[in-house]
A protein has these predicted regions:
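Active-site-proximal alpha-helical segments within enzyme catalytic domains
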Residues: 120, 211-218, 273-294, 348-365
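Active-site SXXK
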Residues: 48, 99, 113-138, 164, ...
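Active-site Gly/Thr loop motif
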Residues: 243, 248, 254-269, 310-359
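Active-site-proximal loop and beta-strand segments within enzyme catalytic domains
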Residues: 38-40, 60, 64-85, 114, ...
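Catalytic-site signature segments of enzymes, centered on catalytic residues
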Residues: 101-109, 171-251, 273
Length: 381
């Protein structure tokens, strides 16, 4: 009688929870502690080991043609403003499935530039600014909080934080010796562009590192400290990253702050400098975003911001807040619409597929990101 009553009570509670939209808690996600990351054999997680090995073999067979010593840097991007390493790693990467490392190839500990993957890191810093109230609403004008002359003109005054994040700011001017118009072979190399009359902020998408660097400087202003310090304290230390990464400024990208000269960093390595990092720390960063901006119970990036960041903007390609999206199925053909990626020249890639609980880091490759992703996914049984 007692057993039946207890059973009835249990069923009643279960029904009540179900009616309230509540369910039994999912197993807690694994978060790697600093300095280590648990590995599991593919078969332990229901993966086909042979298929995964074949996917990795595909990745290893697609080494980039970029010069190992960066001797092609200026011809490709224009005159340098910052330093570069003497060499880069060969193609390498990691596959993280359900939180565990199931594959590793190449020299994943080598620290070198990750180019425009740094843009997605700037987006993360902006998310921290939102969390801390340093940015009120993303649709407010940057000029409301940043008064350094960069938004004084009629063209630049209306620019919002969201427009910077979506690369639709149409900011005009020069910064660190580079003009936002990208005109000139010497300054911009093979990436030079034809003159174009700028539109109103928010009306046009253009992938533009000068404008992103202006955005990075604006983040420095609202935090009152260099962006790398914020990124280390609020992101990288929280996720247990190593101390080997560094965000290298240009030689001339210093501003006065509280009577001191402090560095402002870039959102890429087009003109040298930028984020220098290894594959393990890139994987931790990707895993943070796979987990919705949370790490082991701590919400590093607001969940609402993450959702917005992975929503496509009105203009241009499938692009969110400095993340490449796949909602139209064109960025990563054949992969889920929910997949997204941080992409940098080289090529350097962090690929995230929430539908498959998957993070892939693939560096210094000349292959098809979606093809590698699909081959890994095909190994999931």
């Amino acid at each position: 009688m007692i057993r039946r009553s207890v059973l009835g009570l249990g069923l009643g509670i279960a029904a009540l929870l179900a009616s309230a939209g509540l369910h039994a808690a999912e197993p807690a996600s694994y978060f790697p502690p600093p300095g280590e990351w648990a590995r599991k054999a593919p078969a332990e997680l229901g993966m086909d080991a042979a298929a995964l090995a074949a996917a990795v073999q595909y990745a290893q067979g697609h080494e980039t043609e970029r010069a190992v010593d960066f001797s092609d840097q200026e011809a490709t991007f224009g005159s340098r403003l910052g330093s570069m390493p003497t060499r880069r790693a060969r193609t390498n990467g990691l596959v993280v499935y359900k939180g565990y490392v199931v594959a590793e190839f190449g020299d994943t500990s080598f620290v070198d530039p990750t180019y425009s993957v740094a843009k997605s890191m700037l987006s993360t810093v902006a998310g921290v600014a939102v969390r801390e109230g340093r940015i009120g609403k993303l649709d407010e004008a940057v000029a409301k909080r940043v008064n350094d002359g960069g938004y004084a003109s009629p063209q630049n005054a209306p620019i919002t934080w969201r427009q910077h994040l979506q690369q639709e700011s149409e900011w005009q001017g020069s910064l660190w010796g580079k003009n936002a118009d990208f005109v000139g072979k010497e300054q911009f190399g093979a990436g030079e562009r034809k003159p174009r009359t700028p539109g109103a902020p928010g009306s046009y998408y253009e992938y533009n590192d000068v404008r992103i660097n202006r955005f990075a400087l604006s983040l420095l202003r609202v935090f009152g400290k260099p962006v790398p310090e914020v990124f280390q304290e609020q992101v990288m230390d929280v996720i247990g990253a190593s101390n080997t990464w560094k965000w290298v400024p240009y030689n001339n990208s210093y501003v006065e702050l509280n009577g001191k000269q402090v560095p402002s960093v870039s959102g890429g390595t087009r003109w040298g400098g930028g984020m220098w990092i290894n594959s393990w720390d890139m994987a931790r960063f990707g895993y943070l975003w796979l987990r919705g901006g949370a790490w082991n119970g701590r919400q590093v990036v607001p969940s609402g911001y993450v959702k917005e960041a992975l929503t496509p903007s009105a203009h241009g390609p499938d692009y969110g807040y400095l993340w490449w999206l796949n909602t139209k199925g064109k960025t990563l053909p054949g992969m889920p619409a929910t997949a997204f990626a941080a992409l940098g020249a080289g090529s350097n890639t962090i690929l995230v597929s929430p539908e498959h609980d998957l993070v892939i880091v693939w560096r210094w490759h000349g292959g098809n990101v979606a093809e590698f992703g699909k081959r890994v996914i095909a190994a999931i049984r």
